[in-house]
Amino acid sequence: MDHDHMHDMPPPSPSSSSMSNHTTPHMMMMHMTFFWGKNTEVLFSGWPGTSSGMYALCLIVIFLLAVIAEWLAHSPILRVSGSTNRAAGLAQTAVYTLKTGLSYLVMLAVMSFNAGVFIVAIAGYGVGFFLFGSTTFKKPSDDQKTAELLPPSSGCVC
């Protein structure tokens, strides 16, 4: 392979990180492992900052985002089937899109690698599932009541 034509090309420019080894005072270091502490950035630059109150608010917001995402995931709007109504389809699409967006926001918050954010995200999803997805607070439908009265199947397809 002929590489003679490459001698006219300028050398690659050094990256900004190799040009200086110092960081500016307003930039925070991004963690690549889990860490404990309130001094973090979650979702937005400078939020929650270094304030304990703002960190607590951040944890509450992440918890609520996870609970709402679970509520939307188990919403009756998403379970409507057999309808060919376009309005119902648009409503399902809107709810699904909102749920997916909230889930991605929670995922991005967890990517801050702050252990507190991780714990409240998992707790939010767990509480959301317990309240809206588990059978704890659901009334069984008529089909479920009938199925509970029948003896368990033996697995035989005779």
Curated annotation (Swiss-Prot):
Highly expressed in leaves and at lower levels in roots, stems and flowers. It is a multi-pass membrane protein. It is found in: Membrane. GO terms for molecular function: high-affinity copper ion transmembrane transporter activity. Induction: By copper deficiency. Down-regulated by treatment with high concentrations of copper. Keywords: Copper, Copper transport, Ion transport, Membrane, Transmembrane, Transmembrane helix, Transport. GO terms for cellular component: membrane. Its main location: membrane. Pfam families: Ctr. Residues 1-20 are annotated as: Disordered. The keyword Ion transport applies. The chain crosses the membrane at residues 53-73, 104-124. One of its GO terms (biological process) is copper ion import across plasma membrane. Belongs to the copper transporter (Ctr) (TC 1.A.56) family. SLC31A subfamily. Involved in the transport of copper. This is Copper transporter 2.
